[in-house]
C-alpha cells in the first residue's frame, strides 16, 4: 500500500541523487548512452554491408558456375544461406538499437523528474506518462 509506495519513492530519489549531482549530469549520462547506441548502430550497419557484399559475391559465383554447367556445391549454397541469416540478424539488431534509443530517452526523462522531487507526498511520476 502507501508505505510500500513511499519506500519505493524514497529509494528512487536516493538512487537518482546518488547517481547524479545535477540535471546536467543526467543530460551528460543520456548523451553518453545515446552516443554508445548510435556507435553500435554504425558498427552493425558496417557489418551488414560487409555480409551483404559477401553474399552478393557468393551469389555471383554460384550464377557463374550454373551458367558454365558446373554443379554448385552444397557448402556453397549453405554459405549463401548463412550470409542471408546473418543479414536478417543484423537488421534485427539495428531495429532493436533504434527502439533502445527511444527507451533511453524516456528513462532519463524519468530520472530528471525523480531528481526534481523534494519529497514523496505525491509519489513517483508514472514512467508511462513522462514525456519523451
Predicted regions and their residues:
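Long, low-complexity, compositionally biased polyampholytic IDRs enriched for Lys/Glu and Gln/Arg
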Residues: 1-11, 42, 88
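Short, charge-rich amphipathic alpha-helices with coiled-coil/heptad character
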Residues: 6-38, 65
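Extended aliphatic helical segments
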Residues: 13-16, 26, 42, 51, ...
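Short, flexible coil/linker segments at or flanking structured domains
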Residues: 22-25, 39, 46, 64, ...
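Charge/polar-rich, low-complexity and marginally structured segments
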Residues: 25-54, 58
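Charged, long alpha-helical assembly modules
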Residues: 53-132
Amino acid at each position: 500500500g502507501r508505505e510500500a509506495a513511499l519506500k519505493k519513492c524514497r529509494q528512487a530519489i536516493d538512487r537518482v541523487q546518488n547517481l547524479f549531482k545535477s540535471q546536467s549530469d543526467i543530460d551528460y549520462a543520456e548523451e553518453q548512452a545515446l552516443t554508445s547506441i548510435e556507435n553500435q548502430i554504425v558498427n552493425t550497419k558496417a557489418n551488414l554491408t560487409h555480409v551483404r557484399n559477401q553474399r552478393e559475391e557468393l551469389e555471383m559465383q554460384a550464377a557463374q558456375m550454373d551458367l558454365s554447367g558446373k554443379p554448385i556445391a552444397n557448402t556453397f549454397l549453405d554459405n549463401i544461406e548463412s550470409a542471408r541469416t546473418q543479414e536478417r540478424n543484423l537488421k534485427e539488431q539495428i531495429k532493436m538499437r533504434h527502439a533502445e534509443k527511444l527507451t533511453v530517452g524516456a528513462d532519463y526523462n524519468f530520472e530528471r523528474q525523480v531528481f526534481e522531487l523534494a519529497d514523496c507526498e505525491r509519489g513517483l511520476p508514472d514512467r508511462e506518462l513522462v514525456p519523451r
